[in-house]
From Swiss-Prot:
Main location: nucleus
Ranges of Basic and acidic residues composition bias in the record: 1-28, 36-53
Any one GO cellular component localisation term in the record: nucleus
Protein name, entry field: Histone H2B.4
PROSITE patterns, per the entry: HISTONE_H2B
Gene: H2B.4
Presence of keyword Manganese: no
Annotated organism of origin: Oryza sativa subsp. indica
Record cross-link Glycyl lysine isopeptide (Lys-Gly) (interchain with G-Cter in ubiquitin), residues: K149
Span list, region Disordered: 1-61
InterPro entries: Histone-fold (IPR009072), Histone_H2A/H2B/H3 (IPR007125), Histone_H2B (IPR000558), HISTONE_H2B_site (IPR055333)
Length: 153
């Protein structure tokens, strides 16, 4: 997105001032200069020197979130309650934060014990270290239950 005409950088080079001066001469007094025609994003002119193949769409970056899982848990606990997008974003950030803390603590534990692999034991210990009291106990029991279910299936 191009900056507005009113905003000017503190120090301009002489080469940057010339195109702006040319545009000002072309436009009649009191009228805005006409916008240049632009092609839709991803479509280049035939004569342009871009190395992209014509007709290819730009791939979207996939952003992984916990939103669908948060929503599923919410509906299990309170089927009649919804959640705003801002609250969902906060919950997603919260889960990412807890995940990073647990992963960091697990990595430290593996390094201390000179082990190359993070196992369920390191995860369980890091949960006990990161989460407080009763919350850690419930998290450990739910985690153990999930691992048992996964290995038996």
């Amino acid at each position: 997105m191009a900056p507005k005409a009113e905003k000017k950088p503190a120090a301009k080079k002489p080469a940057e001032e010339e195109p702006a001066a040319e545009k000002a001469e072309k436009a009649p007094a009191g009228k805005k200069p006409k916008a240049e025609k632009r092609l839709p994003a991803g479509k280049a002119e035939k004569g342009s020197g871009e190395g992209k193949k014509a007709g290819r769409k730009k791939a979207k970056k996939s952003v992984e979130t916990y939103k669908i899982y948060i929503f599923k848990v919410l509906k299990q606990v309170h089927p009649d309650i919804g959640i705003s997008s801002k609250a969902m974003s906060i919950m997603n950030s919260f889960i990412n934060d807890i995940f990073e803390k647990l992963a960091g603590e697990s990595a430290k534990l593996a390094r201390y014990n000179k082990k190359p692999t993070i196992t369920s034991r390191e995860i369980q210990t890091s949960v006990r270290l990161v989460l407080p009291g009763e919350l850690a106990k419930h998290a450990v029991s739910e985690g153990t239950k999930a691992v048992t279910k996964f290995t038996s299936a």
